Amino acid sequence: MPELPEVETVRRGLEPVLSGARLARVRANRPDLRFPLPDGFVQRLTGAKILRLDRRAKYLLVPLDRGDTLVMHLGMTGRFEIAAPSGTIRPGDFAREVTPDDKHAHVVFETEDGAVVTYYDPRRFGFMDLIATDKVDRHPWFAAMGPEPLGEGFDAKTLVAAFNGRKQGPKTLLLDQKTVAGLGNIYVCEALHRAHISPFKPAGMIAGKRLGPLTTAIKDVLAEAVEVGGSSLKDFAATDGALGYFQHRFRVYDREGQPCPTPGCKGMIGREVQAGRSTFFCPVCQV
């Protein structure tokens, strides 16, 4: 599933084409994705002007001039492709012929200046909804969500409060969207390794002085992943069709049995399953 860096990569790819654009035509090739599309989906979007493109955790938020916000989640295999007007070159575009009868091309957005943005989703785990803009923050998807890890609202104090007295491991708590928004399995494994913290140690037993470095590791890992376009595992690609490259920088994720890259550490990367997800770690330098 695309995590925060992948969704941010998609947002940045769509922004030059959609921000400030007016939707001349919207086509929904089926009535549902993971959930049914909202009533009047096509009619409510057609003719609307896109004010900007935002991201909250792993959601794309598209406020419109009509008072609605288009909320989109990529699920497991959702992706966008962009075809710009002939002769127009824009950052993030993937110039290709759009195939209207592609069975996985579920929603097509056409702007007044001729750009075509197509949403593909073979497994249909993604979804789209329209929510009144002034109610987005109170919507059940967002109301209890923690701070953005790349924002100023996330710091060591956030983790001190979240970890205090807790018996669960830090990975479990970091994956809880109420603690911090948008973190997923890959980047939590990587951040814990950089901070040399065991994913299995009860969070309440981790000294407070270690949470500053963990906060920094989380921010650094995410920022580096965004910079190189995320991690291309299985189905993810950016809007220009390019693959992300952060997977080439993994220190522990998907590296079971390989030497730990920490200088001076002689450990081997291990893997254990926690709550149905693989946890990659070094048993020597993560304590």
Curated annotation (Swiss-Prot):
It comes from Caulobacter sp. (strain K31). It catalyses: Hydrolysis of DNA containing ring-opened 7-methylguanine residues, releasing 2,6-diamino-4-hydroxy-5-(N-methyl)formamidopyrimidine; 2'-deoxyribonucleotide-(2'-deoxyribose 5'-phosphate)-2'-deoxyribonucleotide-DNA = a 3'-end 2'-deoxyribonucleotide-(2,3-dehydro-2,3-deoxyribose 5'-phosphate)-DNA + a 5'-end 5'-phospho-2'-deoxyribonucleoside-DNA + H(+). Gene3D superfamilies: 1.10.8.50, MutM-like, N-terminal. A zinc finger (FPG-type) spans 251-287. Keywords: DNA damage, DNA repair, DNA-binding, Glycosidase, Hydrolase, Lyase, Metal-binding, Multifunctional enzyme, Zinc, Zinc-finger. Monomer. Binds 1 zinc ion per subunit. This is Formamidopyrimidine-DNA glycosylase. GO terms for molecular function: 8-oxo-7,8-dihydroguanine DNA N-glycosylase activity; class I DNA-(apurinic or apyrimidinic site) endonuclease activity; damaged DNA binding; zinc ion binding. Involved in base excision repair of DNA damaged by oxidation or by mutagenic agents. Acts as a DNA glycosylase that recognizes and removes damaged bases. Has a preference for oxidized purines, such as 7,8-dihydro-8-oxoguanine (8-oxoG). Has AP (apurinic/apyrimidinic) lyase activity and introduces nicks in the DNA strand. Cleaves the DNA backbone by beta-delta elimination to generate a single-strand break at the site of the removed base with both 3'- and 5'-phosphates. Belongs to the FPG family. Its cofactor is Zn(2+). DNA binds at H104, R123, R166. The active site is at P2, E3, K58, R277. GO terms for biological process: base-excision repair. The gene is mutM. Its EC number is 3.2.2.23, 4.2.99.18.
